[in-house]
């Protein structure tokens, strides 16, 4: 009788394991992507326009991708002002980049969900200055007020939002020496800069969605 009970328990465990594997395969594992970039960096601008937006438009509907973007790059520092009541930042590509980064940080605060802020943040990316960005990036159904976003970007609050990104870099990407810097499930992959959509399909998204291109052997 004990032997029969043991066989029965093993059978139940085996069936449960198969059921779990099927459920996991049907739903797929979540892929967590975190990217860091600079507002006036041409490499960041190219990647956002030709890689992350197309990737999201093709794979976002799968519900298997989490994405976070942080407007903070290399050779960037933020320190408290002498009065300690403000923040002074110095950016890789000058003050215009700091302001663009601050504007992006304000947008992300106002629209914390990636799918809501990604189009606006991408629009801001690479613009000559925040005035040009504000002129074209807050039209349509963005749910954002142009004046309020500009005020935020040029305020102490906007500078603080931007400077807070430095702590995130220190925690998640202390070795960052390039922008854009892309982490997938906590690890940096340079291949994700070159063809994000293809790389995700080939290495991380299983089962493979029908939207994916033909697999490449790495």
UniProtKB/Swiss-Prot annotation:
Disulfide bonds: none annotated. Pfam families: GILT (PF03227). Keywords: Glycoprotein, Secreted, Signal. Glycans are attached at residues 129, 185. GO terms for cellular component: extracellular region. Residues 1-21 form the signal peptide. It is found in: Secreted. GO terms for molecular function: oxidoreductase activity; oxidoreductase activity, acting on a sulfur group of donors, disulfide as acceptor. PANTHER family: GAMMA-INTERFERON INDUCIBLE LYSOSOMAL THIOL REDUCTASE GILT, GILT-LIKE PROTEIN ZK669.3. Belongs to the GILT family. This is GILT-like protein ZK669.3.
